[in-house]
Amino acid sequence: MEEMQLVHQFRRMPPLTPAYVGRLKHELRIIEKHNLEPMFLRVREILDLMPDVPHNIRGSAGSSLVCYCLGITDIDPVEWDIPSTRFMHDLRPDAPDIDIDVPYNRRAEVFDRIFRKYGSRVARVSNRVHRDGEFHHWSLHCGGIIVTDDAIPSHMLLKPGQLNMNKDDVEKAGFYKIDLLSSRALAQLNDITDRPLFDYPRQDALTAQVLSSGNSIGIIGGESPAFRKAATSIGVTCMQDAALATSLIRPAAAENKKSEEPLVYEDDVIALIARTCRVESDMADLIRRQIVKGKGMEVIGPDGEPILKDPALRQRVESFRAYAFCRSHGVAYGAVVWALAYHKARNPADFWKSTLAHAHSMYRPWVHPHEAAPHLSTHPRQGELFPLDIREEWKKFGYWSSPQMVPGAELFELEDGSDRWRFCGPIAASRVWYSKKDNRKLTFLTLGVGPQTYINITVPFGLPAGGWTAAEGVAKRGKNGEYTASLVRECYLGGPSRKKKR
C-alpha cells in the first residue's frame, strides 16, 4: 500500500496512533481492491486547479481518512468519530461519490478551468426528462462531470462538453462521476473572510449565543424557522451541536427524533442494523441501501431468510427513505453555519453586507434589510434628502431601511388568565403543510412583532397567507415558546398592495 500513488499525494500525514493507522490501512485496502485510486487522484487534481477557490466536501466523503489526508476534505473523521462505512466498504456495489461545493458565483470559473485543462476528455452529465412516462428530452445535470484518460468518443456526446448519458448510465459504463455544486453559504462566508472553514474554535460563547437564542436570520443554511427551533431546543454550545441542528430538521430525522433511540444520521441506521442483526457494518449498510432504495430486494442470510426480520426495526429503516444526512454531511454544513454565526456575532456589518449581496432567503424581502439596518451606516436609502415613512417605504420598495418595526406590530398577553396572547405584525415567512396522516392542513407563520423580534405561530388549518402582508389574532403560547393560534386574520399595516386576481 505504501507503493500506491495515492499515498505520495497526501497533503497531511495522520498521527501514527493505532486508531489512525488502522483506519488508513482499512481504507487503502478497499481503494486498492476496488480500483478506486484513479477517482481520488482525479479529484485531487481538480482541486489543484482551484487553490484560490474555497471548497467544502458535502456527503459521505467527509468520513474518509484518505480524503482528509489528500486535503480533499478538512473533516478529520477519526477526531469527529465518523465511521467510513457510509462512504465505502467491501460490499458496496458502486463507486462512492465525492461531491464538491464551491461558491455559486465562482463555479463557472471552476468549470472553465477544468474544461481548459482536459478539453475533449471532460464532459457534463445529463438528465433524462420524461413526460407522461415517456422520454421527452435531455437536460443538464446539476453538477456532474466525468474526466477520461482519452478523448470522449463523439457517439457519447449530445454536443461538445455534454454527454448523452445520465448518472446511472455513467455508473454502468464504469466512469467516475464527480459533482461540482454551487453554495451560496460559501460565497457569503468568502466575502467576509478567507479564514479556513475548520479553523474556527469548536466552542465559542458568542457564536453559541447567536444560534441557541434563535438569532440566526441571515445565516444561509441556518435561518429557517425549523433550524432556529432545533437550535434553541437543543441549546447549541459548539460546532458539533450546529451540525446536529442542521441534521435534525431533515424529514427522516424529524420522524425518528421522538423514538426511544433517536436516529438522526444514516450512520445511526447502519449502527442500529449492525447491532440488532449482529452483522458487520458493511453488511448493515447493504441492508440499509436495499430497504431505503425500495427495490423490493432482501439481503438473505445463511438460513435462507432475510437478515432483517424485525418489523419494527424495518419500519424505522424504511422511514429513512425520506431525506436524511449522513454524519459527515451534517458536520460539513454545520461548520459553515457555525462560521457564519461566528462572524454575525463579531463582525455584524461585514456579515450583513455579504448577506444582502448573496442570500436568496425564504423570508419576505423586508426581513434581511430590517435585520441589517442597525449594523449598516450606509444603508441604500439612509441619508436621503426626503426620507420616507416606514409604511410608505415598505409599500414603494418592498422593504424599509429603519431598524424599527412597522408601526402597529405588537405582542402582549391578554389579562384574562388564559395564557392567550394578542399578536399583530408583518409576515416574515409562511408555509402551508399538509399532513397525510391526519388528512389536514397546517399553516406555519413567522411574524415580526418588534424590532428584530419574531414569533412562530402554528395555525391549525390552511390559510391563503402567501398573499397576505400582515396578520393579527389570538394565540396560546406553549412551553417551548411557540404559539398556536385560535384566531387569525389578515390585517393591513402597510407594504405592497395585494395583486387583484383577474
Predicted regions and their residues:
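Noncatalytic, beta-rich nucleic-acid-contacting surfaces in large DNA/RNA-processing enzymes
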Residues: 1-502
